[in-house]
């Protein structure tokens, strides 16, 4: 198995990325292709003992920075580490791609180069949120701001496959993130998706309220990317606030410090359960290849686990199972599937990233990127 990793992407690149890759190669035995500027990567590798480790370098002369517009950068930087890495997957020279770089660029390049799986209209980001009974998958966490019923239906199938074949849930419970448990709650789109999922082969449990998300009420929670991303960001902010509050409490005086020492093992266990670095990254599901999007500020540990996760997706044959489940449910799938899905998906990515070249219509820009990236 070969995993390509964007050595130049992320706030802590290249040092944290390469250190994480070295740990992954040593611990998992994965063949890792470090994509980026050869001289920079070689210099970083000298800081580690890499003798006999399955590491190789694929040169890419350009870097897409975190602040750049995905569409503009992909059009102008044709030898970027993101584009080169994804092309390795396209050509079968790598089984998966991992990047902590510009999320919008990774999504756009994956969609345009790898294309979507048969039966999938839009790719979606799936994140794992911690609960008292193990992680729950939230899909979509930001790839698609506006969604149609058939797209949310497809997200449910992709989340089901993730939960079953990667996390190991025997019969994953799938729910819709909604403002009430009752079947008639929600907007017109969620009501329509509810009807279709109810008829599907999935273990559909109905609507899931926000208050039930962290109680483990479902294994997979379906949402559009707008609501999903807000949910994710609120969760991250809340976790940060709780951490700071606890730190303030336990450093207040000698009694609180003593109390901390008594419960430290339990706090460490809790911290580990909510630490994103333990999960590694978030898969971009629905594209014809395995792509893991890591957090921009990923530590070496997070990168190591993102590489591990990429391997799990390859071994789990996730894309094959997604297509099989789409085929099983094709007769009940909402019929509103239109042509031009790739360009519409790119338009969503540009909108989501908030970085767009001025003076051009979105459709013109999308077409230019689609043609130039090939």
Question: Would you name each region that the model predicts?
Answer:
Residues 88-107, 185, 190-192, 196, ...:
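Glycine-rich phosphate-binding loop
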Residues 314-317, 321-360:
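Phosphate-binding loop/pocket of nucleotide- and phosphate-handling active sites
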Residues 15-16, 28-33, 38-42, 145-210:
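Glycine-rich phosphate/diphosphate-binding loop of Rossmann-like nucleotide-binding domains
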Residues 111-124, 130-138, 220-221, 225-332:
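Glycine-rich phosphate/nucleotide-binding loop
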Residues 50-94:
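Phosphate/nucleotide-donor binding subsite
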Residues 363-374:
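Short, low-complexity, charge-dense intrinsically disordered segments
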Residues 17-66:
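N-terminal glycine-rich anion-binding loop in soluble enzyme alpha/beta folds
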Residues 3-15, 143-153, 293-300:
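Short, glycine-rich nucleotide/cofactor-binding loops
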